[in-house]
Each structure stands twice: as structure tokens, then as C-alpha cells.
Amino acid sequence: MFGSYEKTLDSKNRLVIPSKFRDELGETFYITLGFEKSLEFRSKKSFEEFSNKISSNNLLDSKMRELSRYIFANTIEVSSDKLGRVIILDNLLKKAEIEKDAVIVGVGNKAELWSKEKFEKITNIYENEENIKKLTQELFEKGAVL
């Protein structure tokens, strides 16, 4: 998935999922609280792969159990209605600091939902070409492949 779309949640916390994202996510998919106060949307297949990666770690390690608890306790399964809307639980919206205006962003095999204000803050840093070069260099030094 790729691209970004500005969206507004209605009074019932319903969000219209862009049709291109609906095609990839399917009618029923998973929403998880992300690490940077965003919500992550994954298809059933993608969530199963994600879940298996987490479960394949050493669950004897207390930190891994904490992370597993955090992820799975903050995940819901949702189904879209005929208009492509999903209801997002209030507790997840509060944790992600999303009130009404939001941006949904395609990020490869998942989509992320951000508050519009937070998304603008984090993306404004990269309007400067030097910041993008610095980020790219740091990632290459860590072994990233683009």
C-alpha cells in the first residue's frame, strides 16, 4: 500500500477506508496500536505473519512477553460496512491521540492512521532535503537496503 489520504472520523468513530486500501486489506482486517501513537491496519494474512513473528520469539524472556501483551491487547479485528467504513474503538483512538481529523498512509504491507496534526509534524522534518539524506545515510549504515 502507498499514498496518503486525509480523512475525518464521524461521531460514531467510523472511518472510510480508501478503496485502494480496502482492496488490499479485505473486508475484515486488524487494527493495532503502533509504537509511535499511530494505528496500524493489516490484512488477515499480513497480521497472521506479524503474529507468527512475534510468537516465534523467546517467550521465556519477560521483555518479549511484555511486548506481546502490548501488541495483542491493543489489537482489534474489524469488518467494513457496505460504504467501506470501519468503527474504531474509542480506547485505541485515545491511545493514538486521534480525535477527528486523520491521515491514513500506505506503508508497504500495512496502512497507518495518524492524527492529522501529528502526521504533519513528523513529515515536516523531511521537507528539507538534507534531513532526508541524513536519514538515508543512517539507515544504510545500519544495513538497510532500499
Curated annotation (Swiss-Prot):
Cytoplasm in keyword set: yes
Keywords of the record: Cytoplasm, DNA-binding, Repeat, Transcription, Transcription regulation
MF term (GO), any: DNA-binding transcription factor activity
GO cellular component: cytoplasm; nucleoid
Compartmental location: Cytoplasm, Nucleoid
GO biological process: negative regulation of DNA-templated transcription initiation
Listed Pfam families: MraZ (PF02381)
Residue span, SpoVT-AbrB domain: 4-46, 75-118
HAMAP family named in the record: MraZ (MF_01008)
NCBIfam families, alphabetized: division/cell wall cluster transcriptional repressor MraZ
Similarity comment text for this entry: Belongs to the MraZ family.
Subunit details: Forms oligomers.
Protein name: Transcriptional regulator MraZ
Organism: Mycoplasma mobile (strain ATCC 43663 / 163K / NCTC 11711)
Taxonomic placement: Bacteria, Bacillati, Mycoplasmatota, Mycoplasmoidales, Metamycoplasmataceae
Name of the coding gene: mraZ
